[in-house]
Amino acid sequence: MLILTRKAGESLHLGDDIRITVLGIQGKQVKIGIEVPGDMVVYREEVYRRVIEENRMALDISNADLLAATKIWHGRTK
């Protein structure tokens, strides 16, 4: 992990397309601005982790669920 020190109003760049600016500091809270290309998605860490977990749960399909869906699809439910 690269660790940098920035003051309010100072920025850093990630590649050519991403700019992160420290907008202000109040106590233990830092307000940052992030400039990214319009096609790039930016998530807060807690939101990103929730999205990943929900996607993982959506992919967890049991064999019984697949068998039931197959029977329904083919019209052979009992």
UniProtKB/Swiss-Prot annotation:
Compartment(s): Cytoplasm
Q: Does the keyword Ligase apply?
A: no
The record's disulfide annotation reads none
InterPro entries according to UniProt? CsrA, CsrA_sf
By sequence similarity, the record places it as follows: Belongs to the CsrA/RsmA family.
PANTHER family of this UniProt entry? CARBON STORAGE REGULATOR (PTHR34984:SF1)
NCBIfam families listed in its UniProt record: csrA, PRK01712.1
Its biological purpose is as follows: A translational regulator that binds mRNA to regulate translation initiation and/or mRNA stability. Usually binds in the 5'-UTR at or near the Shine-Dalgarno sequence preventing ribosome-binding, thus repressing translation. Its main target seems to be the major flagellin gene, while its function is anatagonized by FliW.
What name has this protein been given in UniProt? Translational regulator CsrA
- Gene symbol of the encoding locus: csrA
